Every structure is written in C-alpha cells, then in structure tokens.
Amino acid sequence: MKTIIALSYIFCLALGQDLPGNDNNTATLCLGHHAVPNGTLVKTITDDQIEVTNATELVQSSSTGKICNNPHRILDGIDCTLIDALLGDPHCDVFQNETWDLFVERSKAFSNCYPYDVPDYASLRSLVASSGTLEFITEGFTWTGVTQNGGSNACKRGPDSGFFSRLNWLTKSGSTYPVLNVTMPNNDNFDKLYIWGVHHPSTNQEQTSLYVQASGRVTVSTRRSQQTIIPNIGSRPWVRGQSSRISIYWTIVKPGDVLVINSNGNLIAPRGYFKMRTGKSSIMRSDAPIDTCISECITPNGSIPNDKPFQNVNKITYGACPKYVKQNTLKLATGMRNVPEKQTRGLFGAIAGFIENGWEGMIDGWYGFRHQNSEGTGQAADLKSTQAAIDQINGKLNRVIEKTNEKFHQIEKEFSEVEGRIQDLEKYVEDTKIDLWSYNAELLVALENQHTIDLTDSEMNKLFEKTRRQLRENAEDMGNGCFKIYHKCDNACIESIRNGTYDHDVYRDEALNNRFQIKGVELKSGYKDWILWISFAISCFLLCVVLLGFIMWACQRGNIRCNICI
C-alpha cells in the first residue's frame, strides 16, 4: 500500500495536479446546535434519563411559610374554633356576623363555655365553612311558662355566669315546665340554619330540679325531616366544673317550610337563625401566620405560587392550586438534546457538526453555522429555525398548567369515630386519586419531553437538508454534520448559504473542477477507485507470472509431468 501511495504521489506530480491541503480553493461549513457544559436530566417515553440543555421544574415543593390575605379574605380563628364562634362562646364574640373566604383554625383554639358535643360535628363545620358567614338574625320565639336565659359558672361572660349567645337555655318556671310547642315559618327566599341543643344532666336530682319531669324529650321537625332526642342522664368526666353535657343539633329550613319545636324539658332553644349562602368558602387548620401578600393558592403550610402545574407541599389546598402529586420533582424539557462539545477540539481544532457534538457558547440561537475558509473562521446563529423551535416549546408549560391547576379547593375530610369505615374508604379513594394523578403527571411530562426532543432534532435535520439542497454537487457531506465546499467561498458566499440566497450554478464549474482533483494521501478523489483497481490488476498479473514461472521450472526439473490426450 505504501508503494501504491508513493506511486500515486509521483503520478499526481507528473500530471501537475495540486495536492489537497490548506488551499484557498475550498471551504468547510458545519451545522450545529447549542450545547452547555452541564445539562439537565429529564425523563422521556423511551429514555429514563436523557440530558437536555434546559429544563423547567414542574413541582412546587416549598411554601412561603405564611398565608397571604389577598386575593382571598382570610379570617383568623385565633383561639376559637368555627363551631365555638357559631354557638357564641363568650371568648369568640368578636366573630359575630363575620364573613370569610377561608376560616383558619389554630391548634391553640379552645372552648371556654359549657361542655358540649356535636354528633355530626364534621358536617356542621363543613356546612358553615362553605357558607362563609356567621350572619345571625334574631327571631321572636315565644316560650311560655318557662324561665329563659339560663347560665352557668362554666361559661363566664365577664364576672357573671353566662351561656352561648346564640342559644337560649330554658328551665322550669316555679315548679312547672309545660309542654312547649312553637312554630316558625320560613317566609324568605333563602335557607335558614337553626342551632339547638339538648341538655343531659348528670343526676336525676339535677334533672328534676331544672325541668321537673324525670325525663324530658325534644322533637324538632320540618316538612322534610324530624329529630327526636331523649336526654341521657348520667355522670360524665368533669370539664370546667361540670359533669353534665349539652348535645348540639342543627336543622335547615328551606323557603316555604316551617320549623316546629316540641319539648317537655331539657331544650336548649335557638334564638334565631344563620343565613345560609352558597359559595366556595372553606376552612383549614393551620398555624402558619397570616401576612399581607398575594397568592391564589393556600395550604396549611402556607401560600404557594401557582405558576407550576404540580405541588408536593400538602394535599389540603384552597384556591387555584397546582395538582398534588407524590413526586418531589418533574422536569419539563425546554431545550434540546445536550451533547457537550469536546473541549480538546478547540474552536476549529477539528471542525465538527451536530452529528458529533453540540457547540457551547451559542448565546444568540439554538442552531447555527460554523465555517472555515480563506478569510478565517466564523460562527453565526440561524434565527429562523431557532424561533420555530422556541415558538412550539414556549406554550408547553402554560398548556400543562391549564390541564392540571384546580380552580377549586380540596377540603379536609373529617368523620366521627362511628364512621370509621367510611373514613377508611375515603382515605383509600383519596390515596388512589393521588396515585393516579402522580402516574398521569409523570406520563404527561415524559410525553412532552419526548415531543420536545424530537421537535428540536427535527429542526436541526430540516436546516441540514435545506443546506444540502442549496449546495448540491458543489459540496460533499462529510458525515459529521459538515460540508466540504469545493470552490472558493468567502464570507459573503457563506452568508448567502445561511440566508438561502446561494446560487449553486455560479460556482458549479469551479466546484466540479476542484472536486475531481486527486487528494493525495486522503484518497478521497475520483481516482481512488482507479488506483485500487490498477493495484489489484497488477497484483493479479504478478501472481500469475510467478505461478507460471514456477510451473515451467518444475517441468524442466521433472517434478511435474503434463500429459495431453487427444
């Protein structure tokens, strides 16, 4: 082979051909894309980890640590629960007739009145919370033959004995407690919420001393419902000096309906009604401080931005919030596949295109050109292909947010001990929903990432094919994203290729002439095949001569005998 190369060299000299090298009659043009030294790993449908030049985090994993009071109206419960504020606990009087979008209950909240229980506490709490108001209207109930406004030392209002301000404790008058039968129609066009109760004395003596009868009864009815409660007399654990209890009940009276109260003792009567409203108000348990700031989304941990489609802060939210998922991170590719530049090359130590690696330092575009010609080297971005890719990628984040952000709140689910199985079922359903959303989120992001990478690769290929169609036979595809241009191509010529105004006919003759020049040791010209065929033919000829000479020599020595038969 060395002999062949040497002969080729002599042959080229004899014909007066120019050897390839750093002449001024050719140029190199490479196409490439942006790259960064350290990219970001994302997940796609086909790859668990693929490096891209840029990515955006989609999961909000931290809160501000404070609850913003704008645009939602936040009502701080301070040391009162919503039910205590509803009943009119003396230390919660400041909440009378208040309104809210979100009522925040604190862990330090406590009751400071007569000990009570609410058999359907969660439902009442949720009902009042969603109404968003404690607006109370006093009504003129007529209670004949009984003593009103009972009080207790367990419920101090100032230095005096008191009671819940929204309830009326009825006891005997003298030595009688007549049967009470009171009606109250709803002539308005809204629902009315009535709160009432039943007193459970701790002893029979307390029962008769308050209500005369040994056993009382309370029945509250509307056309749609009826509740009858018989007091349970018996001692209970002491709370604020009392072993008796009050059970709190509630009744909703629709427009046109009638409230009927019938009792012969133990009645804790309503003083009026709460005006019910429909809305998206809610309640949340949180110890985060309330601050003057703006946030659409609130969690018990504090407010969070809603500029991301997912969050991992808390399942409980209020407002327009990202969807809760289990993942701590989900990254959306907002750049192309990253192939860091090989630093040993230098800028043009060995010029290479996008097939080998990306180009670092392209700050003015995602795709571009590098060239090497008689005037030196240079680089320029292709803004058209860059903008085409950016336009399609920019809307991705907004589309994902639109698909996932909830325009409603996820309230706390509470159940009584009796409803334990329902609570377990609810928890299972919620956990299943979270699992499904977490899976869907991961799949959605992987699909979008796959599309982004395919899209950016496609734009690179489009630019390469566009350049190839312009150059035609005037250049040769070097296989690494570069073209060897076989004519003198100055900077103006390079610019015409970049902007699509290159006229290949102008340079055709020069390119064809240079293209067929022998390229010396590179053996890349059209003579390479001829030289190889000639070398092969000469080798075969010499082999035949040697073989024929050996046969003739052997015949002369008598080692080989040939018989020819006719």
Swiss-Prot record:
<dbReference type="GO" id="GO:0019062">
    <property type="term" value="P:virion attachment to host cell"/>
</dbReference>
<feature type="glycosylation site" description="N-linked (GlcNAc...) asparagine; by host">
    <location>
        <position position="499"/>
    </location>
</feature>
<feature type="lipid moiety-binding region" description="S-palmitoyl cysteine; by host">
    <location>
        <position position="562"/>
    </location>
</feature>
<feature type="disulfide bond">
    <location>
        <begin position="113"/>
        <end position="155"/>
    </location>
</feature>
<feature type="transmembrane region" description="Helical">
    <location>
        <begin position="531"/>
        <end position="551"/>
    </location>
</feature>
<feature type="lipid moiety-binding region" description="S-palmitoyl cysteine; by host">
    <location>
        <position position="555"/>
    </location>
</feature>
<dbReference type="GO" id="GO:0016020">
    <property type="term" value="C:membrane"/>
</dbReference>
<feature type="glycosylation site" description="N-linked (GlcNAc...) asparagine; by host">
    <location>
        <position position="38"/>
    </location>
</feature>
<dbReference type="GO" id="GO:0019064">
    <property type="term" value="P:fusion of virus membrane with host plasma membrane"/>
</dbReference>
<feature type="glycosylation site" description="N-linked (GlcNAc...) asparagine; by host">
    <location>
        <position position="97"/>
    </location>
</feature>
<keyword id="KW-1161">Viral attachment to host cell</keyword>
<dbReference type="GO" id="GO:0055036">
    <property type="term" value="C:virion membrane"/>
</dbReference>
<keyword id="KW-1167">Clathrin- and caveolin-independent endocytosis of virus by host</keyword>
<keyword id="KW-1032">Host cell membrane</keyword>
<feature type="disulfide bond" description="Interchain (between HA1 and HA2 chains)">
    <location>
        <begin position="30"/>
        <end position="482"/>
    </location>
</feature>
<feature type="glycosylation site" description="N-linked (GlcNAc...) asparagine; by host">
    <location>
        <position position="301"/>
    </location>
</feature>
<feature type="signal peptide">
    <location>
        <begin position="1"/>
        <end position="16"/>
    </location>
</feature>
<keyword id="KW-0261">Viral envelope protein</keyword>
<keyword id="KW-1133">Transmembrane helix</keyword>
<keyword id="KW-1165">Clathrin-mediated endocytosis of virus by host</keyword>
<keyword id="KW-0946">Virion</keyword>
<dbReference type="GO" id="GO:0019031">
    <property type="term" value="C:viral envelope"/>
</dbReference>
<comment type="function">
    <text>Binds to sialic acid-containing receptors on the cell surface, bringing about the attachment of the virus particle to the cell. This attachment induces virion internalization either through clathrin-dependent endocytosis or through clathrin- and caveolin-independent pathway. Plays a major role in the determination of host range restriction and virulence. Class I viral fusion protein. Responsible for penetration of the virus into the cell cytoplasm by mediating the fusion of the membrane of the endocytosed virus particle with the endosomal membrane.</text>
</comment>
<dbReference type="Pfam" id="PF00509">
    <property type="entry name" value="Hemagglutinin"/>
</dbReference>
<feature type="disulfide bond">
    <location>
        <begin position="80"/>
        <end position="92"/>
    </location>
</feature>
<keyword id="KW-0348">Hemagglutinin</keyword>
<comment type="similarity">
    <text>Belongs to the influenza viruses hemagglutinin family.</text>
</comment>
<feature type="disulfide bond">
    <location>
        <begin position="297"/>
        <end position="321"/>
    </location>
</feature>
<dbReference type="InterPro" id="IPR001364">
    <property type="entry name" value="Hemagglutn_influenz_A/B"/>
</dbReference>
<keyword id="KW-0732">Signal</keyword>
<dbReference type="InterPro" id="IPR013828">
    <property type="entry name" value="Hemagglutn_HA1_a/b_dom_sf"/>
</dbReference>
<feature type="site" description="Cleavage; by host">
    <location>
        <begin position="345"/>
        <end position="346"/>
    </location>
</feature>
<dbReference type="GO" id="GO:0046789">
    <property type="term" value="F:host cell surface receptor binding"/>
</dbReference>
<feature type="glycosylation site" description="N-linked (GlcNAc...) asparagine; by host">
    <location>
        <position position="54"/>
    </location>
</feature>
<keyword id="KW-1162">Viral penetration into host cytoplasm</keyword>
<keyword id="KW-0812">Transmembrane</keyword>
<keyword id="KW-0472">Membrane</keyword>
<dbReference type="GO" id="GO:0039654">
    <property type="term" value="P:fusion of virus membrane with host endosome membrane"/>
</dbReference>
<dbReference type="GO" id="GO:0046761">
    <property type="term" value="P:viral budding from plasma membrane"/>
</dbReference>
<feature type="glycosylation site" description="N-linked (GlcNAc...) asparagine; by host">
    <location>
        <position position="181"/>
    </location>
</feature>
<keyword id="KW-1164">Virus endocytosis by host</keyword>
<comment type="function">
    <text>Binds to sialic acid-containing receptors on the cell surface, bringing about the attachment of the virus particle to the cell. This attachment induces virion internalization of about two third of the virus particles through clathrin-dependent endocytosis and about one third through a clathrin- and caveolin-independent pathway. Plays a major role in the determination of host range restriction and virulence. Class I viral fusion protein.</text>
</comment>
